[in-house]
Amino acid sequence: QCAWNDEWNHFDEDKQNEIKARQGVRYPNLEGATIMDPETMKGMPKDGKTIGEIMLRGNVVMKGYFKDKAATDKAMAGGWFHSGDLAVIHPDGYVKIQDRSKDIIISGGENISSIEIENTLSKHPSVSIAAVVAKPDEKWGEVPCAFIEMVKDKPTSEKELISFCKETLAGFKVPKQVIFCELPKTSTGKIQKFELRKKF
């Protein structure tokens, strides 16, 4: 059941916020909801670290896409609905979404969550909005590149933001480039990452 556990009241505020940031557990009417490797279709360990794709199965999941067999076959491969959301599963069964599969950055064989980098950058006082996408790289295949909208009258620099990220992120997750610009958005304010990828 997705409900607050009284034992969590004893944790400090940071730990409680970390718990609240998780997305929850399997919906009772679902036959199955788990995290799997989309290639092997094997379940991921419940360690809160290993990233896999959220897979769903049950009579509340769609049967397929209207008149699109190819898309249906891809989405339902292996008898599970492939959500496109990448997540980890914790020992208590709670899931935390890390990224969309199309937004993950694969650098030197390592999967990097763009959301993790964006969350780090957003903690800097000069950053209003951050968006991170994969930039092609000859050596690593892809590397993180950050696009930043700054807070008005609070200037910063590429060097400062990279140093800021190095304080909390593993070296391979630190953006290799920071670009300051107005971010392209939809009418509802969602950042259009596909437009940012076109810049490379």
Model regions: which residues?
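Short alpha-helical interface patches
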Residues: N9-K20, E142, S163, R197-K199
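Conserved AMP-binding/adenylate-forming
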Residues: Q1-Y94, S101-I104, I117-E118, D153
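AMP-binding/adenylate-forming catalytic core of the ANL superfamily
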Residues: G58, K63-G64, K74, L86-K173, ...
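General small-molecule cofactor/ligand-binding pocket signal
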Residues: V178-C181
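Short loop/turn motifs at secondary-structure junctions and domain boundaries
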Residues: G24-Y27, A77-G79, K139, V174-K176, ...
